[in-house]
From Swiss-Prot:
It is found in: Vacuole membrane. Its main location: membrane. One of its GO terms (cellular component) is vacuolar membrane. Residues 232-243 have a biased composition (Basic and acidic residues). The chain crosses the membrane at residues 35-55, 120-140, 152-171, 189-209, 278-298, 310-330, 384-404, 418-438, 453-473, 488-510, 522-544, 553-573. This is Autophagy-related protein 22-1. It is a multi-pass membrane protein. The lineage of its organism: Eukaryota, Fungi, Dikarya, Ascomycota, Pezizomycotina. GO terms for biological process: amino acid transmembrane export from vacuole; autophagy.
């Protein structure tokens, strides 16, 4: 894929450019247009993350399989004129607005010689998708740091991912397995593109004109951002916000020298741009979610749902794909290439062995991850917290997928209501990101205590769902997620808790990292996150197959959520900080012989997506 090179900088711009660190580096000052191009991709892809992966893709997969499935006991079709439930609505109720299949029988579909529940099919698909995504993230992380690969990979992932969403409009029930393949490709492209997108951030910040101006004033007061987004001197910022000293500084790899000024202008600007990008992405997701609900409601008034219950859902995914593609085009136009260092290729017979170099970089990425693992297991506090994070991130991913399918198959909620449920959780997540720092300051909670409080509130979700097994509540027909309205308060809890956990776990882990190894350890943090999310959905899928009910997954989820609490309580942050400093000193003594390795910068890329 070829891209038109950006226009050469003007002489005026040359005056403010920093020196190049390697041949071919683009040190053109970052423009507002380029920042908007960076924002544009977040606006593009976050819509697929929230509206696609978080809402309509699980429903579409389940409904596609259901329209090809049969009832386990009678082998009658789950959907259609021969289905046992078709007479309940005299053939007039669209499949979009109700759950098909008998209440006490499960709908199964044949796959690879096995009969699996249609809800399990969706869970297994996402479990496999996350596994492929994790392998891709680690393997491709090293490639994007070189030459024009950064922008090439970003656009490739964006265009391929948006195409998978748009192609769903052609996925009919007879080829429902093709939908699973599209989900795997789409989820992989989504996660990989966000990692590459975040790798642009340190480059944009380093070339920002205000950063260049601030860097010339050495030995002066620390600069901070004013309300107009420019830097101005400010005293004792670290005293106002000491936790910034432990935040991740982009671009630092394993064995690099730690930053002497963690509250530097670069970090402040990076935080500001990143936060705004996340906010714009979520706002775009909510907007498209509202548009999708309107589209679903309008299509429910037509004959399309009678043809296939998935047609309206597939039109929504078409809308999501078009949105992703359109804003990726904006990014293609406005975001500069910002090439990395050239690959040191060798030639054989006049041909450049670039593929051999790429394979070497892939191997280096895995080698770097393994090297970090060996260091991490020597740090007791890091080791314990990573186990806790492994369980916790798996629980978060499992609850999200299970809740959507539970609302659709157990509570018989319409797709429109499920969309409203997703909006509720998204808005609550945005609220939680701002709420938990206030709660933590108000009650003077340590980071570990805030995390444990979030986990305790998170446990409410599966425990409440299990109340329906109590005969008294089951007889009442309410309490224990037996009525659709009951899931909305839990969606608020889920959103608020998730917003707190994502930010506090990351910052708490930053306290334990050996100084100078931030990027490598956050790469391990990201790999732990993605790798763990394979297990939970697969186990819940097996429970659904065994029992025929999505509700049975609440037992596993309840155990999974509570397990990290004692582990987080066991982590001593101060001891972990001292262990990290001691490890950094030991690493520094043996680092000199390892400097200059070609992939030194590559370790940081995966971390930027954490």
């Amino acid at each position: 894929m070829a891209f038109t090179p950006s226009s050469p900088p003007s002489p005026a711009a040359d005056a403010s450019q920093r020196p190049s660190r390697y041949p071919g580096e683009d040190t053109t000052p970052t423009s507002r247009r380029e920042i908007l191009g960076w924002y544009a991709y977040g606006i593009a892809a976050e819509v697929f993350a929230v509206c696609g992966v978080g809402s309509f893709l699980p429903l579409t997969l389940e409904q596609l399989a259901r329209e090809r499935g049969v009832l386990k006991s009678s082998h009658l079709p789950c959907v259609g004129p021969d289905a046992p439930t078709s007479s309940l609505a005299n053939g007039t109720a669209p499949a979009l607005l109700r759950r098909d299949g008998a209440d006490n029988d499960q709908c199964v579909v044949g796959l690879l010689g096995l009969e699996i529940n249609t809800a399990s099919f969706a869970m297994y698909t996402f479990s496999l998708a996350v596994l492929v995504q994790a392998l891709t993230l680690i393997s491709f992380s090293a490639l994007a740091d070189y030459e024009n690969n950064r922008k090439t990979l970003l656009l490739a992932f964006g265009f391929i991912g948006s195409a998978t969403s748009m192609l769903f409009v052609f996925v009919a029930p007879p080829v429902f397995t093709f939908g699973a393949i599209l989900v795997i490709i789409g989820v992989t492209c989504l996660g990989s593109s966000f990692v590459v997108l975040n790798s642009f951030l340190p480059v944009l910040v380093a070339n920002d004109p205000s950063i260049q101006g601030a860097s010339k004033e050495a030995d002066e007061e620390l600069h901070t951002l004013n309300e107009n987004g420019q830097f101005e001197p400010r005293d004792s910022f670290s005293e106002r916000n000491p936790e910034f000293e432990s935040q991740y500084t982009p671009g630092i790899g394993l064995g690099s020298k730690p930053s002497t000024n963690a509250t530097s202008p670069e970090l402040q600007l990076s935080t500001r741009i990143s936060s705004k990008g996340v906010g714009l992405g979520y706002c775009a997701a909510v907007l498209v979610q509202i548009l999708s609900i309107g589209l679903l409601f309008a299509l429910s008034k037509t004959s399309l749902p009678k043809v296939s219950g998935t047609l309206p859902l597939r039109f929504v995914l078409l809308l999501v794909g078009i949105w992703w593609f359109s804003f990726t085009m904006v990014t293609r136009r406005w975001l500069r290439n910002r090439p990395g260092p050239p690959l040191s290729t060798t030639t054989t017979g006049g041909h450049t062995n670039k593929w051999r170099v790429w394979l070497r970089l892939v191997g280096f990425a895995w080698k770097s991850l393994w090297k970090t693992v060996k260091i991490a297991v020597q740090l007791r506090e890091v080791r314990v917290f990573l186990v806790a994070w492994f369980l916790l991130s798996d629980a978060i991913a499992t609850v999200s997928g299970t809740a959507i399918l539970f609302a659709r198959t157990e509570l018989k909620m319409s797709t429109t209501l499920v969309g409203c449920l997703s909006i509720t959780a998204t808005l609550s997540g945005m609220t939680g990101a701002f709420l938990w720092p206030v709660v933590s300051r108000r009650f003077k909670l340590k980071s570990s205590h805030t995390i444990m409080l979030c986990i305790a509130l998170f446990e409410i979700i599966p425990l409440y769902g299990m109340l329906a097994y109590i005969p008294l509540f089951k007889k009442w027909g309410v309490i224990g997620l037996q009525q659709p309205w009951e899931i909305f308060p839990l969606a608020i809890v889920h959103g608020i808790v998730s917003g707190g956990l994502s930010s506090y776990c990351r910052s708490f882990f930053g306290l334990l990292i050996p100084p100078g190894s931030e990027a490598a350890f956050y790469a391990l943090y990201a790999a732990t996150d993605k790798g763990s999310s394979v297990i939970g959905p697969a186990i819940v899928g097996m429970l659904i197959d065994a029992t025929g009910q999505v509700r049975s997954g609440f037992f596993f989820i309840a155990i999974l959520i509570v397990l990290p609490i004692p582990l987080v309580w066991m982590v001593n942050a101060e001891k972990g900080r001292m262990e990290g400093v001691a490890m950094a000193e030991r690493m520094a003594k043996g680092q000199e012989s390892e400097t200059g390795e070609p992939g030194e910068e590559a370790e940081g890329l995966l971390a930027r997506g954490a």
